[in-house]
């Protein structure tokens, strides 16, 4: 991967200016959040039962909003690694209907999954919107994943 960037200048994760300037806006709405079917399952949910949001550049900040109504069955969980969103790891946050979460995190991927174990009618628990501010740092420079790191 290093060869790809050897002959040109680019900013990296430690470039302070990339975080001081205004971020490039990025929005995705009506993201269908699938039902996990995994509550109580010690093996966790399958990889197919999650929505993945990929960012083209490293984020400066990210906001996740649960667009569903504040009723039973509209909760979602969000995580910053594929393993984190699973039941067995429980390294996720929960948003009830109409709640949102914002943070200044450097990420290139976000994982969303339905949370309510009693939901049975259909495959979509709720919908979500994601708003992010992008830096000029290419996503490929934040290599790998947060999987395997404590708390993620």
Ranges and model annotations:
Residues 1-41, 116-152:
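C-terminal interaction-tip segments
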Residues 4-5, 9, 63-65, 111:
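Residue-level recognition of well-ordered secondary-structure positions
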Residues 5-6, 57-58, 106:
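Short, well-ordered loop/turn elements at secondary-structure boundaries
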Residues 37-40, 47-77:
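Beta-rich globular "head" domains
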Residues 40-50, 75-111:
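A cross-kingdom feature marking solvent-exposed beta-strand/loop segments within repeated
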Residues 62, 103-128:
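Noncatalytic modules at the cell exterior or secretory-pathway interfaces
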Residues 67-74, 84, 115-119:
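Acidic glycine-/aspartate-rich tracts in secreted/extracellular proteins
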């Amino acid at each position: 991967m290093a060869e790809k960037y050897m002959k040109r200048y680019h900013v990296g994760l430690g470039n302070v200016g990339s975080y001081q300037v205004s971020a490039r806006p990025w929005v995705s709405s009506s993201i269908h959040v699938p039902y996990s079917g995994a509550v109580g399952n010690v093996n966790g949910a399958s990889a197919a039962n999650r929505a993945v949001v990929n960012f083209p550049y490293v984020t400066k900040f990210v906001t996740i909003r649960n667009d569903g109504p504040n009723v039973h069955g509209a909760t979602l969980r969000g995580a910053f690694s594929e393993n984190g969103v699973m039941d067995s790891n429980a390294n996720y946050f929960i948003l009830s209907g109409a709640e949102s979460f914002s943070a200044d995190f450097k990420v290139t991927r976000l994982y969303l999954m339905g949370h309510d174990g009693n939901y049975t009618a259909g495959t979509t628990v709720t919908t979500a919107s994601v708003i992010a501010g992008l830096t000029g740092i290419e996503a490929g420079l934040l290599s790998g994943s947060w999987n395997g790191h404590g708390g993620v």
